[in-house]
Swiss-Prot record:
Organism (species): Arabidopsis thaliana (Mouse-ear cress)
Protein name: SUMO-activating enzyme subunit 1A
Annotated function: The dimeric enzyme acts as an E1 ligase for SUMO1 and SUMO2. It mediates ATP-dependent activation of SUMO proteins and formation of a thioester with a conserved cysteine residue on SAE2. Functionally redundant with its paralog SAE1B.
Consequence of gene loss (knockout): No visible phenotype.
Residues annotated with N-acetylmethionine modification: 1
Main location per the UniProt record: nucleus
Keywords for the protein's UniProt record, in alphabetical order: Acetylation, Ligase, Nucleus, Ubl conjugation pathway
Any GO BP: protein sumoylation
UniProt subunit comment: Heterodimer of SAE1A or SAE1B and SAE2. The complex binds SUMO proteins via SAE2.
Pathway annotation from the record: Protein modification; protein sumoylation
Lineage: Eukaryota, Viridiplantae, Streptophyta, Embryophyta, Tracheophyta
Subcellular location: Nucleus
SUPFAM superfamilies: Activating enzymes of the ubiquitin-like proteins
Gene3D superfamilies documented for this protein: NAD(P)-binding Rossmann-like Domain
Disulphides: none
Length: 322
């Protein structure tokens, strides 16, 4: 991603942000290739932010046909059926993003992520999955980890007014300012599979309840063959049954996961634009840090709950069991 120097046009366009994070960081951004799959409200906010930041290219994957339902919280889809009729979500969002910053190459890739081989992911520096199944997240993360080069991997999921971000930067080196000098730092990230397989009992009780609740919902959707968000209040009994099974298997009290939180997650299928903006903005910030190699990255989960307006970072790894 080091590549050549910024062009005169790039320097002029990105002048303000260059003053914030420096020309070298901007140069890395303009050479970064990012794959984004699953474009709903939060991911739309993320895409807007990274396109405005001036990444090299963004490849979008979302074969859903654009319709009134897809319009929910996704400002990249114009509320005009004459514009979006017959087009996929990725195609419509691609057109909108090109208007934000013509210097960023925005393209569309069709197909199913879970059917793509390792070689496909090699062309990217960052992979972001929005609203994918647990199986898809595991599959893509595994493919990224098999590559010779390091590909930063992220997932994001917003339900009701709650949001989750997962980060896997593998073995990551970066610099940060300490006192008056820049110091070299290194972090080791667990894979998605490793992070969600950590036994619950050793995890501190103060850990965000959303971490556990999201795992319950993932297991429910997978075991019932549901797509992301295909649940309602009618499913609450089954969700609570799975919660009980997981708590017993992990030797923790069922109070670890409040029933009311699970109810919110399965009934709140509509995204909240303010939450989309917050979580999508944080995700964009983390990707920019990872690409530029400057600043402490998020390790490895982030949770936001619009009910109390609090965001927390949780480091979930096998360090709890060692």
């Amino acid at each position: 991603m080091d590549g050549e120097e910024l062009t005169e046009q790039e320097t002029a366009l990105y002048d303000r942000q260059i003053r914030v994070w420096g020309a070298n960081a901007q140069r890395r951004l303009t050479k970064a290739h990012i794959l984004v799959s699953g474009i709903k409200g939060t991911v739309a906010e993320f895409c807007k932010n990274i396109v405005l930041a001036g990444v090299g290219s963004v490849t979008l994957m979302d074969d859903r046909l654009a319709n009134m339902e897809a319009l929910n919280a996704n400002f990249l889809i114009p509320p005009d059926e004459n514009v979006y009729s017959g087009k996929t979500v990725a195609e419509i969002c691609s057109d909108s993003l090109k208007d934000f910053n013509p210097m960023v190459r925005v393209s569309v890739e069709k197909g199913d992520l879970s059917m793509l081989g390792t070689d496909f992911f090699e062309q990217f520096d960052v992979v972001v999955i929005g609203y994918g199944s647990r199986a898809t997240k595991k599959y893509v993360n595994e493919k990224c980890r098999k590559l010779k080069k390091r590909v930063a991997f992220y997932t994001v999921d917003c339900r009701d007014s709650c949001g989750e971000i997962f980060v896997d930067l593998q073995d990551y080196k970066y610099t940060k300012k300490k006192l008056e000098e820049m110091v070299e730092c290194e972090l080791n990230f667990p894979s998605f599979q490793e992070a969600i397989s950590v036994p619950w009992k050793p995890i501190p009780r103060r850990t965000a309840k959303l971490y556990f609740a999201m795992r319950v919902i993932e297991v429910f959707e997978e075991s019932e063959g549901r797509k992301h968000g295909e649940c309602s209040l009618l499913d609450l009994a089954r969700v609570l049954e799975i919660k009980k099974q997981l708590c017993e298997a992990n030797s923790v009290s069922e109070s670890h996961i409040p029933d009311i939180l699970l109810e919110r997650l399965i009934t709140g299928t509509t995204e909240f634009p303010p939450v989309c903006a917050i979580v999508g903005g944080i995700l964009a910030q983390e990707v920019i840090k990872a690409v530029s190699g400057k600043g402490d990255p998020l390790k490895n989960f982030f949770y936001y709950d619009g009910e109390d307006g609090k965001g927390v970072m949780e480091d979930i790894s096998d360090s709890f069991t060692s």
